[in-house]
């Protein structure tokens, strides 16, 4: 919602360095399976070839959608750590950041790139600190804040955070709740679950089609479209 995450390149750069493989191996003995979208491992997840509904909506809003919306993120080949660091640095450089004296700073005002992540789960602190160590390699300062449940809930409802740890539970028959998660009206509605502040006409139209679908096939196509757009991030 706020600087520096109002820039998609910054969001991508820091997420690239989330050490999923390391955490899965060391802390979870490779028992986890990484997800890439809200409806993974179901017929609602985005497909490699856009369906008719996807093509229609993406074409209509093509000037407002990132080219990433035309790709399926989880079919990209995984990169090694060095390649991930290089890609993250390139993304930050494109958005006006540079590494100077081991700190990522703005080219414009020399302000350091720093952000906090809040959670109410003490067990998450260990995972987030591993992420902080990874980000330190490119000069980004991540600060982990563990709060009690009441403070965490207050921060969520008032959108008072840089980033959070939150888990969405998705239905295989999505409906009106998608407005609350990703809809335009919910972006500024205190207490909604649109924590990221998503406000995009293509996403609103996808949700409209989901809610008004007359058959399962149309609902599947619209949900796959929403999945593509959420993964694209812009």
Regions found by a protein language model. Name each.
Residues 1-233:
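Extracytoplasmic/periplasmic ligand-capture domains
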